[in-house]
């Protein structure tokens, strides 16, 4: 694996796609109290808590993991 894969240092940053995480907050009112439910949907291909980035064919690496700023 190329050293560029660690930082996903692609020449064209538009080739890197950040897999996002969506959050849904539901507030349900009951007779006695308020309950909050948070549902976090994470992409099925994501295997850790960090974001994932895939560099295109024009980059020096493919399938690199990173959190682009």
Swiss-Prot record:
Transmembrane segments: none annotated. The keyword Metal-binding applies. One of its GO terms (molecular function) is copper ion binding. Expressed in leaf mesophyll cells, root tips, and at low levels in anthers. Keywords: Metal-binding, Metal-thiolate cluster. Signal peptide: none annotated. GO terms for biological process: cellular detoxification; intracellular copper ion homeostasis. Coiled coil: none annotated. Metallothioneins have a high content of cysteine residues that bind various heavy metals. Functions as a metal chelator of copper (Cu) and zinc (Zn). Plays a role in Cu homeostasis, specifically in the remobilization of Cu from senescing leaves. The mobilization of Cu from internal sources is important for seed development. Belongs to the metallothionein superfamily. Type 15 family. This is Metallothionein-like protein 3. It comes from Arabidopsis thaliana.
């Amino acid at each position: 694996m190329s050293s560029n894969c660690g930082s996903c240092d692609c020449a064209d940053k538009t080739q890197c796609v950040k897999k996002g995480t969506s959050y849904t907050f539901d507030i349900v009112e009951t007779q006695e109290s308020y309950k909050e439910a948070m549902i976090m949907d994470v992409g099925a291909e994501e295997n850790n808590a960090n974001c994932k980035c895939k560099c295109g064919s024009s980059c020096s690496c493919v399938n690199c993991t990173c959190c682009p700023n």
